[in-house]
From Swiss-Prot:
Keywords: Amino-acid biosynthesis, Cytoplasm, Histidine biosynthesis, Isomerase. It comes from Lacticaseibacillus paracasei (strain ATCC 334 / BCRC 17002 / CCUG 31169 / CIP 107868 / KCTC 3260 / NRRL B-441). One of its GO terms (molecular function) is 1-(5-phosphoribosyl)-5-[(5-phosphoribosylamino)methylideneamino]imidazole-4-carboxamide isomerase activity. GO terms for cellular component: cytoplasm. The keyword Transcription does not apply. One of its GO terms (biological process) is L-tryptophan biosynthetic process. The active site is at D8 (proton acceptor), D129 (proton donor). This is 1-(5-phosphoribosyl)-5-[(5-phosphoribosylamino)methylideneamino] imidazole-4-carboxamide isomerase.
Amino acid sequence: MKLYPAIDLLNGKSVRLTQGDYDQVSLTEDPLYQAQRLTDAGFAHLHLVDLDGARAQRPINRTVITRIREQTSAFIELGGGIRTLAAMEIYLTIGIDRLILGSAAVSDPDLVEQAIARFGSNRIAVGIDTRAGKVATNGWLTTSQQTANALLTAMQQRGVTTFIVTDIAKDGMMQGPNAQLLADLQQAMPQATIIASGGISLLADLHRLQTAGIQAAIIGKAWQTGAIELAMLKQMEG
């Protein structure tokens, strides 16, 4: 199983939020130290989120993101505040491997199609963040009327092959992922690569996701709190 330890950036620091609430910040750490720690542990993939960018709707933490890129050879995917082709160009030029478009997929689906045409489907993913069955945008501060299934279908028709799916109610709660939602989406779209995000707190959660047909997952609070040791996660990844 492919694992993406997460580093969420707020004011240049690595933090964890609970259910995406900017007022519930915990675990403030040095993101460069965390990235090095993950690299030293052998992880080949990192998931970065610019929380300031998601809220401001434009890139904010570019300096620290660039420094993380410079210090690790890991595959890095990045989301948060990426709303223009120019912003995508900047991040891809500094060596970010894949960009995650979230709010833009809802507000400007043509932009997603343009990005894929320009950069390739392997460099662009779509983040689908759900709250009570509906897609949330703008750093999870706004909830649209679009369902996860509808957005996934629409984006797949525009050439998207990789999706990061988060159930906001599970995020940061350490109570297990919404395996049923993920399984339903994967079954409906078997050709899509779905990366699970939110709620993973035990190795058993990862086994459940594998059983549901999910072959990649983002690990946030679980690795940062030590709920799952990095050595055990690396063993799970193989």
